[in-house]
Amino acid sequence: THIVLVNGFARRYESTGEECYRKSVANFWNMLMHSHAYVNGTSSGPRPNVTTETSLTAEHWGEPCHLCNTLTKGIAESCVTHNTQRLNASLFSWTGNPCYADVYMNMFYNAVLPVQSRSTGAYVYHLPLGSPRHKAYMADNDFKCCSGSCAEAFAKLNNGIYYHDDSAVYVNLYVPSKVHWADKKVGLEQAGGFPVEPIVDFTVSVRRPVDFVLNLFIPAWTDGAVVYVNGEKQEMSVRPSSFLKLSRRWADGDRVRIEFRYAFRLQSMPDKENMLAVFYGPMLLAFETRDEVILKGNKDEILAGLSFADSESGRFVLKNGEREFRLRPLFDVDK
């Protein structure tokens, strides 16, 4: 409910220009992301330090940065995820700040897509993130708040891919798609297997050569990317959490390729250093096990045990001590 109110502040700022409402939205976002968000950018959980009738339900924000004891089976309400994405989109459209694009991308792949079953289309009310946990889907005849929020979220998956101003187009998400920029009479087609594959291709369509800037988002999780224009490698500085600017006169059929550098990484809970999440590139990985996952060694030793199960399946292996775990992207888990 609170996030919906703050989204109302955003609409009021856009309608009236009242600065206090813009500040309210930005301050709320900072509090949410820096003190209450899980590794995939979403939030909400129980309040185990409080004893009330509703304290153990998964629709609270508790003490700031106290998250490790909230990983019950029901956390990360889908309404919270959807409405946080609306905040991310508003703040980016006002500022162009890459930090909002970073959170939007993280949530898109690791909080939004995982709430829907790939086989049935059903949605979860809460997205479990602890260990061991499984997804519990709503029934076809359920009519909960998240039933509507999820339907809206999946009807608007294309909303955050592209932005533009008078002279530039911004690519915030890497999703196979086409966009037509009416003011410049420019078409842009995007292709590739991102996020499973690190290569994305673009093709420009114009009636006559036109000048504009193509801004490609470089997420915080990558330590490098290589860009080619019409097959020629571009010698450009690439910084995480920024936009790589390609400014030129574009002709019909011009091609751009970006190749991201993927790596495994571990992210800790803010209040418990040894409670970890495993990522590969942009993807949050889930363990394929019914048991509590307890790992041995320090972070470097755990990272050294991670590898691909094979090059095509999108599955991963973690060899840790005498045990071997299988992992896959959270959005690919159906149960």
Can you name each region flagged by the protein language model?
Residues T1-E14, T72-F92, C150-L157, P198-V200:
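Well-ordered alpha-helical segments within folded domains of soluble proteins
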Residues Y13-A26, M33, F92-D102, R208:
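Structural helix-adjacent loops and short alpha-helical linkers that scaffold large soluble proteins
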Residues V25, P98-V200, S205, R239, ...:
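C-terminal beta-rich recognition modules with glycine/proline-rich loops and embedded aromatic residues
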Residues T222-S247, L266-D271:
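Solvent-exposed beta-strand/loop surfaces of large extracellular or lumenal domains
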Residues D223, D252-G253:
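Short, flexible surface segments
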